[in-house]
Structures are given as C-alpha cells and as structure tokens.
C-alpha cells in the first residue's frame, strides 16, 4: 500500500511532520491522566522520526506501532481524546498507509466505541473511509465492520439510525462493486490500482503478492454477505455477520433489492450466486408471500359471527416483496424461468376482487413495469404460453386485466347505487351529474365517474404505491386508480405485442434480454395474438364505451387500430374482424349498431363469442340506467337513419344521435383503412358500410370527382342538426375519406378488387332501396368514381367491372341515381383520355376503344338527361383532346363560330372556354394572320363587363400569347404577311418589322386595359404588361423601344395620373360583392394601387433599358419626365403611393454605374464623345439632386401654406378642410427610403456639393428626425430594429453623415470646409438623447387629420414617442471619433468645436441620474474624457482660440461630479453606485494627469476652479445633501480619497519632472514666471481650504458627540471623522516633505490650531476613530520642540523648514 501523495519525498516528509505534531498534541493532552498513552505517543514520535529520514513509503512499516496510542486513546472514554484519535485514524486511512493488521486494530477500536455508544457518527465516518479508501479490509474484519454499522442502525437516536442506514447501503454496494474488479469488468479500475505499484517501492510489492487472495476474497465476501442478508430476512441466524442482534425484514428486503437491481451481472456470471438466488431468495419470497395469497377481504356475514382471519398481509413487507419480485422478473427471468412463472401467477391472483385494494394497486403497478418491455412479453409467451404444460401467463395476465377493468367499472357503479339507495349521500366526485360540465379525463359507467388519476407516457411506467417506502400502514387507494393504471397497461401491452411482431429493437437491451430467432418468431407471434386478442377486446370495448375525454378514447382506439393491423399482417382473420367490428359498432348508438350489424354478427360464428351480448354490453347497461338527458351534453350531431333493409321501422322513424365519441371512432376507422387497406380483405364491406351510414347521418353529399361535402339541411327537418364544432370538422372528415380512397392506388391488385367488390355490393343495396322510392345513398357510386380516378395508371385492371356497374346505375329509374351514374362515367372517360398513359393514347388504339366504349353505350339509354350529359361530354372531349382525337379540331372551330352577340352569359362563358383552349393548346397550328385577331379577341373578352373573372382570365391569355410569340420567334420572323392591313401603324418609327408590330399591338391593348374602370382588371393588365416587357422586351429592335416608351408607357403614366387625381373619394358600394378592405374602399384608393403598379413598372423598365435609351436620343427629356412623375407621386398624400415612388427613385439612383460607363464608353462611342457624356452625366445627376431635395424639403415640412384656419368661424370650414388635406405626416418607411437614396446621388454630385447644399441637406435630416411616428409604423420600426436599437431612419441618417464625413476627411477633399458644420449637425442630433424633439402644431392641425391617403374620413392620425436615446448616443460617438482625427485642423480649432462639444455634453452630465437612460451620461463623460485627452493638448498649444472654453468646462465637471440628482442604493444598486464612483474617479485622474501638471499653461481662474472642485470632493460633507443612506458615505470614500490625494499632489509635492529652477522662491521669480507663482499660490490656497474644512468637521463632530450623550453617533459620522483624521496625518507628513515655497507660515499656524480639536476627540468611544486620532497626534511630534533662547537669523519659513527635518 503506497502513500497517496504522488508528489515524492517532500509530501511524505510533510505528512510525517504533521503526524509528529498530532502525536505531540495527543501526548500533551494525556500527560496527566493517561501516562501510558503519553509514553506510547513518544514512542510513535520516535518511530516516525526514524521513518521520516528513510525511504518514501517507510511510514507504511510503522503504521501498526503508531496506531497503538490511537487505539488506547479510543479506550479512555474521554470524548476530546477520542475525537482527536479518530481524526488521526481518518488521516492515516486517507493517506492509505493502513494495512490489514492496522485495519483490524482500527475496527476493534471502533467496535469498542460502538458498544459504549460514544461518537457514533464519527465511528460511521471512519468505517466508511476504511472500506472505501482501498481494499485492505475483507473477510472477518469486513464482516465485523458491517455488523458494527448494523448495530448502530438499530439504536434509538434517529440521526445515527439514518446515518448508519445510508452507510450500510453504501458499504453493501461497495462489497459487490469489488467483485467487478476481479472479473475485469472495469479494466480502468484495475489500471488505476496498478499505477501506484509501478511508481512505488516496498509495501506495494507486498500488497501485490496478496492480489490473488483479494480476488478470491472479494467474491467470497459478497457471497457471504448476500447469504446472511437472506438469513436475516428469513429470521435466521447469520453465518458470517457474527454479532448481529437484530434486523428488520423491511430493511433487509431493501438491501436485497438494491443488490439484485445494481449487480445482476454478478449473479448471471457466477454459479454460486445463481444457486443462492434460485434456492434461497426465491424460496424466501414465496414464503413471505403466504399471507398475501391466503388473505381474502370478505364482507361481514349477516349473522354477525366473523370467520377466523388468516394471517393479515403487512403493507411494508408486501410492497417490498413485490418490488423484489419485479426486479427478479425483469433482470433474472432467463435464469429463473420456473420461479418467474410462480411469481407471475401470484401477481395475477393479487388482482382478484377479494384482495385488498392496496394489494391490487401494487400488483397492477408491477404488471405495468413488465408490459412496457416487449422483450419480456416475448419471453413470457415463448417460455409459458407456447409450452404445452405451462401456465398461459400472457393469456392469463391479459384476461385478468380485462376482468380487473370491468370489475372496476361495475364496482364503482354498484357502490354509487348502494350509497344512493341506502340513503347515504354519495360523494360528489363519483357522481357523473356534478361533472357534466367538466372535460375531465376518465371513465363513466351508470353515473359513476372514475377520473384518470394517473397518466403515463407511452411505454413508461411510474409506480406510486411501490415507492412508498416510508409508509407503515396501507394507504387509501382512490377508486379510479386501478382503472387508470389498467388502462395504461392495456395500451402498453398492445404496444409491446406490436414491438414483438414487428421486431422493434429495445432502447436499452441488456445481457438478460431473451433472443428470439427467425424460426421462433412466426409461431411466437401467432401465439401472442391467440393469447391476447380476446382479453384485449373484452377490456377495450368497455373502456371505449365509458371513456369521457377525447384523448383517452383516442389512445384506446389507436391501440385497437394497431392490433387489428397486426392481426391482418399475420393473416389472423377472426381477431382482425372482431376488432374492426368493435370499432364499427362504437361509431353508432347501441340500438342503431345492433340493427346494422345484426347480419354480420350472425354470419361470424366464431367471432360472436367475443362480441357483446345484451347482458354483457356495458353500453346497453349504461343506456338502460340513464335518462336521455344524460346524453344531451355529449350529442354533437342528430341525423336521419340511412334506409336499410336490416333496419326495423321503429328505428327508421327515430333520429340518430351521434356523440363526439362516435365521430372519433369514425376517424379511427378511417385511419385504419387508410394506413392498412392492404390487409382488410373481406372486412372492407364492414368498414365501408359503417362509413356510408356515418356520411348519411352527417349529411355529407357527393360532389365533383366523388369527394363528399356538407350540404345545408332543409329547414323542415327540425329534429336534425349538427353542432358548430362538428360543422368545422366535416371538411376534415371529407378530406380524410378522400385520402382513404386516394390511398387505394398503393394497394395491390387483389386488395383493390376487394375494395371495388365491396363498393359495388353497397351500390347494389342502394339501388334496391331506390326502387322502393326511398332516397338512395350515393356514397358507393361517388367512391367508385374516386377510386377509378386515382387508379388511372392501371385503369385496365378495374375499368370493366367499374363501368359495367355504373352503366347499370345509369339505367335506374331514380333520377338522382341516374344523374350520378352518368356523372361518374363521363368524368372517368374525360379523365382517362387526358391521363398520360405509359403507352401514349394516340398509339394505343385498344385502350382508346376500351375507354370510349362506356360513353358509346350510353346511347342505348332512353332517358333524355343522360343523353344531354353524354353530348356535353363529347363536346368537352373534342375541345380538350383535339390532338389525340383526329376529329377534334373541326369541332372547336364550329363551337367558336357558333357564338353570336345576342347569346347570353352561359354561351359567352362556353365560347370563352373554347378561346382558352385554342390559345393554350392550338396556337401552333393557327395561321399567322389569325394572331392579331386572337389578340383583339382576347382584349375584347378582357374589356367585357358581364363577368369579371372572364376579363381577368382573358388578360392571362394575352400573357400566353406573348409566350407563344417568344417560343416561336424564328418561325414568326421568317413568315412575312402579304396583307399588312390587319396590323396597326405606329407613327414616328420608320420601317417597324412585322414581328415588332405584333408585339406593339399586344402592348397597346394591354396598355388600354391598364386604365379600365375595374381595379382588378387594371391590376392584372398592369402586371401582365410589365411582366411581358420584362420577359420578352429583348426581342424588340432598338428603335421600337422609343415607340414603346413614348407611345405606350409615358401616355399610360399620364393617363393614370390624370384618372387618379379625378377619382372619387366616396366609399365603394360593396353590396353583393366580397368584403372590401378599408385600404381599397374608395375609388381614389383603388387608383392609388394602380398608380403604384404603373409607376414602379415603368421605372423598372426605364432602369433596365437605360443604356439602350441613352443611345437613342431624348434621354435627358425622358429622364426629367420620369423624375417629375416620381416627384409628383412622392409628394402624394397617399402613403402607399409616396413610398412606392421613393422605392422607384431608389431603384433608378442605385443603377449599376459600371454598366453605364461600359455602355457610354464602348457601346455609345460612335454616338457621343466622352466630354458630352460627362456633361450629360453631370446634368442628369444635378436634376436628380434637385428632385431629391425638393421631395425632401416638401415632404418633411411640417407646416402648410393654409395654416391658421379658424374652425369655429362660419365661413372657415372649407379652408379648414383644405388645410387638413394639405397637411400630411410622412411615414417612417417613407423617410427611411428618402434618406437611403441620398448616398447614391452624393456619389455623383460630391465634387459640386457646396456648403449651401449641405445646409439644405441638414435641414431635411433635422426635419425628418423631428417628424413624429404614427402608431401604424411602430411594427415597421420594431421589426427592422438592429442590435444597436437604432431605427432604420436614424441608422440611415447617421450613415449619410458618416459618408459625408468620410469624404470630407480625405486628403485634398473638395468638401473639407464642411467639417465644422458636420460637427454642429452631429451635436444637434446628440442633444436629442436628453431632450427629444417635440412635434408642436396648431391645435387645428395637431397630429394631422387627412382626408386622403391612409387616413380617410378625417380620422385622427395617432402618433407615438420615439426612442431618440440610441440615436443621440451614436451621434456623440461619431462626433468623438471625428474630433480625435480632426482636432488639429485649423477650421476645427478656429470654429471652437471643442467648446461646442463641451457645451453639448454638459446637459447629460448635469442631468446625470435624471437622464432618460444611464447609458447617456456614461457615454457623455467617456466622450468628454476622450476629447479632453486630445483637445487639451491643442488648447495649450493654441490658447487664443480656447479662452471661452475653461469656465464652461469647469462648470460641466462640477455639475457632473456633484449632481443635483439624487441616487440611492434602492434606485441603482450597490454595484452600479460603485461603478459610478469609479467613473467620477476617472475624471479626477484626468484632472490629475492632463490639467494640474500643466497648470502654468492654463488660465489662473480655471486652475482655482479645479482646486475648489477637488477640495469640495476631498471630504464627504461636500456632497452630504445627496446622501440619503448610511452606506452611501462609504461609497464616496474612494472618490474623496482620490480628490484628496490629487489635491495633496498638486499643492504640496513637487512634480516628478520639476527642475531645480522651479523650487526657487516665488518672490525671486521674474514677471515672466507668473504661471508658476500662480500655481504655488493655488497650492497654498488648497492647503488652507483643506485645513479650514478639517477644522469645521472636527468641531462639528465634537459638538455632536457631546450632545448625543451615551448614544453613539451614526456609523457614517464615525467613518467621516476617521477619514478626516487620516487625512490630517497624511497632510502633516506631506507638509513636512513639501518645499518651503509650497507651505507658508499661516498654514503651519492653522495646522497647529487644529491640535485642541484633536485633543477634544480623545473622549470618543469609537475604536476606529481612536486609531485614526492616534495616527494624527503622532504626526505632531516633530512640531513639538523646546523654545529657542537665542535669536534666529533665519526667517519664519526657514524655522518651519528646520522643524520639518
């Protein structure tokens, strides 16, 4: 065993020294009473001295000798000595120097202490250390140590009992963990054990030699310990744990459980352990279970003689036994097969009704733990159910759970009825009536309510009563707890069975998990289903019927779906059909379901035994015991029953009432069929029959394509209705139905035929009923159609059976049957012809014949309505499939030519559909000369006013035409039309190609539609026009572009502007139309949308083709014109229009300049020389700048030309309204866009950017900032805020300022003279952080009322405050950075920019804590410090320009350091105040470093102000008006100290760079050194002021202390006087060291005058004040000297100087 230091001999030496010191202490303690211990200690010390001088590990050899005095000490019964000895033992153990013999000594000593009840907790700690530090303790010593802990566990002290219990659990686990070491289960632990041996000598080798013994011993110890635990639990004497006097069975069971839970590998790998487990533990468990098995809880007999009770089970024992059994089954089932069978059978018996409720609750919790693991279920089935002579554990368990669930429901009902019949008031929690309004989870049967008191995640068990280890008595079990857990068990059982069948791997497999081979899997799965299906079904049926909430029902139904699917996968038809039948029956009221499925139930003989009989049907029992009113809250739909041959007349007359649960079951059936349609087989008929009935009851009717939709009920059906909530679910149900039949495309051919046969069977039944003049169900026909549509890829598989049945339907005499039969056939034929088959239909004549055959056969039907639909279908086929059918094209021409002007809307619609088909599909085969006609025809349909949708679709057709032109350009260009008269002329363009004329014809027609009276048409036409130009404009020749711009686009803009200005402002009548949004409810607003669309579209075209237009001439005129259009729109009072105009302007301004240069320099070289291009460029950008400036000045000007209206005057109403119309607040988005345009313009005009331009620009910026924010713009600001919290507008403004600043600071910049103006503008912005701009307007105009734009009807525009703080702070930061780079610029110096900055930051610094944000003043002071670091140097160099700075600077510093605003800890917190004081100290440090060393270079008055400021801050009293709390005094101490030290440094001590010349007496200096004299004078003044302040504080303290009597002064007063006394001591020291010029005689006199006040302070009772006073008085020593008898030749100053020595 090695010493654990690992640090070499030095650590050993330290340890030995510590031991020696401890032994010396022990020797002193025992010297008088216990001399023998003293002698043993001295001997131990000598041993240690010898050991310390030898090798590192030699302490190990002497440990047994030095343990002797410690063991003796433990026998003294002296608590002090015992504690000391135990502490030394623990240190020896911790250092791992105790061997086996020493461990025995220590254990014996601890045993003695235990027997004498001394220091039990210390004893337990020592035992724990001894066993956990290493492995030297084993065998009998280990047993004795464990017995010691057990004995302490059964003392009377609860603290010791709990500590001992925890220790025993830890040590038992430790004993078994050691087994893992010898099994090499944890190689890293072995590696750690070997590491010390490789680096040590001596004893480690000896320990290594015993490693083999240890390995054998560890397993032996664990075996003996476990064996004795079993003995003790069995109330027998232990073999190994000798000395045990008592052991509770509960504690023993807990220890057994812990071992079996955590160390299963030990038992699985060792035969001895396995044998012990099988023979001893299992026998013990079975024996202890005896009371539980025999006990029966029976009601008392009537004769009053109670039977002799058997031994009553004890809850703590039973609960721990079941926990143990649970572990044995889960972890040891593979080695305890027979025993687990017994255990499982016992647990199942515990569910019997005659067992106590708590016993049943414990049993279901154990079962829940087991069923969540699919591997266990598989093992149970394989080991028991599959064996011939074994118990069918899985079957019995599930059957018992089913019985348990049913009993729980029936028992709750019986108990409730018994209470009510017996006159006892039933508990309100069990009465259903009291819970009718609650949506609680649970089950209800015959008025008894069983809430779900426990919920579990899927596959997770959570025991409640199995965890009650601290309970001595059986708890009261809620009535509903059993069914709550039982419900979860059934769900998890289903899930586990699914995991076995689908071979889902477990998340946490163990070595104990049973392996199921492929050969075993199939029989196992079949047996699982056979063992489980009847029990599960018998439990699920009552659970579904009695569940109260959707979530519970959903879980149960999902389990039934999954189980039915599993049965289908295994081809177990009987269980599959039984589960599906149960779900189908649950979808209807019981009496209705019995009538529907009467035949189905009789036909399946084997299934009937597992379905419900009348007496067993819990739902029918529930119905018989409840009134109809009980169902009212649950009923969500009431409908008429579907006529059926099986329904008796009485059922037909009564309405069918569906509950929410019925609909939930319907959804479950849909999910089952959708996801598992391939395994339904013959069950399809049952599923579809159920869905048909539900669809009928809910009123879903077939619509186009076979889908179902909810139709409004006739008003006469008063007793039929559907709740609103269900009405919302009907589309979802319809969609689910459609998806079910869409999924049929994934079925194989056999499954698909099963589905078709089931649908045809249902349809035949409906036809039979229709012959009796009953309303037929069209469900089957509709779904046959839907099934055919989704199976088009294999239409030949189902076409003949499908269409043959539909032809029969078409011949039916009932008109609705006929109507839907022909609808299905025609729809299928049209769809089949349009479908893209693998072999093209045009080539597959056989398929084409088969598809057209049913349509031809319809000619044999005599009914006229069927023939009409047939002809319509033929016409549609000719029109839609003309390329496939050779005779299709002539029919299209005939139909189009058949339309005349007098035809009504239906034929116009049909004709237009034909036109759509022609343009969409047949333009390629149309003659060239028809293309202009097609354009004009489409435009005619676009301008017709009968049907808006036709107009919009016609515009879409014009886009299709343009696409055709583009795709066939080569063909169209090569074809020359001889008859040119059909093409229009476009004047001004010479020899325009015919292809271009075709395009211009299209563009002109679209341009006319862009000014249609209908907004939707205008919008669609505009989008189409610009999309067409964008997509296909490149096909035009360059000269044609000029015609397009001047003859189409600019006239369009002019027309839109004119029509917009003349549009009405009255609300549009929306009667008969859809609702119109408020932003489009007037013609003016609708024209605004058009204006936005056209302007942005034209600008986009102009921008895209700018290079091309520049080459064609008239570009400047076009540029000016389009900018005028933009300016006109930007100044519109409609926010949408103005913002769109700015976006268009932005798009034009940010046009790619490199492209311009390329076109101008290369492409345009032949047209214009570079000089002309440059002049033109300058001219167009000057126009752009003027337009921008005009927009900016006008839009941000917040007063109107019609101001001062008189609203109260008689004739002033019109003027008031006009002024309100002219007044308009631009939005933040508008202003942001405006500002963001400037950088693009500035890039081109910066050379000519004058100070006047800058002033105008700043006017726009300032106005924009001051404009208030409207409430509707707040989301815009919030959604675009950056991390710096700047709004986009503020961000853009500062970006512009930085852009100009960056340009102005470049070398040889043209605009460098703007730097001072930039500073002033930034400082204007910075002031907004403290004083945000306010929007002031006349009362009549306040927050603008506008009758146009977004704010119609004179509604007030509400505005909100904007956060200007980030904007102002960012401005300050930019200003500081700019000043640091331009401080030495002549213009900056002359314009006194530093003074301006000081004045700007004075406001936030003076406000300080009154600032809106603390960041403002903090930024202001850091900015001031930064600029002063830079600016003071400039000020000293050029003092003539800074004369006005100093007073403002001193005033600013004073107001900041001593603010009027109060700050307390409650306001800001202690840390914040400390940080604030640190900032104040930084300011003082600035004065110390940058001002005071250069005092002779600064104005005398300024230096005096600084001295006064430092003096004011050097003592706390200077700011006593702002101090509200005692702790604040201390917070200013650092600041006061900094001020005081700075003052001393300035007034008394020499500068470190001073020369000898500076120390000459001030009177001897020439006049030129007045600055230095002023400095000395200021220093003396500072000393005098300090001394005067000291005297005031001392005097006031003495007076207050005398008046206070025995009451001590507040702490802050004592702190203040202590600081003053320390300051006096420091001042005296400094005055002694100061040169004579610094200190004059009056100062010494004043200092000496303080002495009486100091003497008065000696009466204080404060130790802190006394210490400080002592330091001050000691400094007066040098001032005390004998009076001189002879005259001195020196002057007073020299005397003082001598006195300083």
Curated annotation (Swiss-Prot):
Keyword terms of this UniProt record: Protein transport, Transport
Superkingdom of the source species: Eukaryota
Low complexity: bias regions: 187-200, 1204-1218
Renumbered residue ranges of the record's region Disordered: 187-209, 1199-1219
Pfam family, one: Sec7-like_HUS
GO BP annotations, alphabetical order: protein transport
Functional note: May be required for traffic between late Golgi and early endosomes.
Family: Belongs to the MON2 family.
Name this protein carries in UniProt: Protein MON2 homolog
